[in-house]
Amino acid sequence: MPIGVPKVPFRLPGEEDAVWVDVNRLYRERLLFLGQQVDDEIANQLIGIMMYLNGEDETQDMYLYINSPGGAVLPGISVYDAMQFVVPDVHTICMGLAASMGSSILTGGEITKRIALPHARVMIHQPASSYYDGQAGECIMEAEEVLKLRDCITKVYVQRTGKPLWVISEDMERDVFMSAEEAKAYGIVDLIALETS
C-alpha cells in the first residue's frame, strides 16, 4: 500500500468498536483509486475489487478516481475491459492527470458519467514499445504487437468519443495534452466538476 493512504474508521457488522483501516472503508463505499502508473499489480487490484463489488451489488455505481501518468498497455486494457464487463455504471473522475493509459481508462467510464476536475489534464498518444534490444525477428514481432495495441486503443477512443478514426489516429501520433474543457470538447469526459467556494 502506498505511503500516505489515509486510515479511516471502519466497523464490521456485529462489532462494537471501529478499527482503523486504510482503504477497505473506501472500497465498501465503492470508491476506487488509480493514483499511480498502471501496472499488473494495480490493474489486478482494481479488477478484483470491481468484480467483488459487482457480485456484491449490481445496482450501486462505482467511482474510479484517476491521477495517473499512464503505464503498461495490457494491464490498462484489462481495467478498461473490466469496467465494460461489470453491471454497475463506473463513473470516472480525473483529478490531476490522466495520461496515456490513464486517459484510456478515463474514457472507459459510463458515458455521461465521466468527469474532470477543473484543473485536470488529459493526454493521449500512441503506445510505445519497450523492446529495443534483440534480434531482428523479435523486434518485428514486437512492432506488430504494438501496432495491434495501437489499433485497439484507437478503436476505444473512436467508440467512446465519437470522433472519426482519422482524427484519433492523427492525434495519437504525438503527445496531445488537453485541459478539462478541451477533454470535454474532445469527448473524453462529459462533465467538468464545479469549484465550490
Curated annotation (Swiss-Prot):
What family does the database annotate? Answer: Belongs to the peptidase S14 family.
Note the superkingdom of the native organism.
Answer: Eukaryota
Keyword set, alphabetical order: Chloroplast, Hydrolase, Plastid, Protease, Serine protease
Q: Name one GO cellular component term.
A: endopeptidase Clp complex
Subunit-structure text: Component of the chloroplastic Clp protease core complex.
Q: What is its main location?
A: plastid
Q: Name one GO molecular function term.
A: ATPase binding
Q: What does this protein do?
A: Cleaves peptides in various proteins in a process that requires ATP hydrolysis. Has a chymotrypsin-like activity. Plays a major role in the degradation of misfolded proteins.
Protein's name in the database: ATP-dependent Clp protease proteolytic subunit
The GO biological-process annotations, alphabetized, read as: protein quality control for misfolded or incompletely synthesized proteins
Catalytic activity line of the entry: Hydrolysis of proteins to small peptides in the presence of ATP and magnesium. alpha-casein is the usual test substrate. In the absence of ATP, only oligopeptides shorter than five residues are hydrolyzed (such as succinyl-Leu-Tyr-|-NHMec, and Leu-Tyr-Leu-|-Tyr-Trp, in which cleavage of the -Tyr-|-Leu- and -Tyr-|-Trp bonds also occurs)
**Pfam hit, one:** CLP_protease
Give the species this sequence originates from. Answer: Angiopteris evecta
The top EC class, named as a word, is: hydrolase
* HAMAP family per UniProt: ClpP
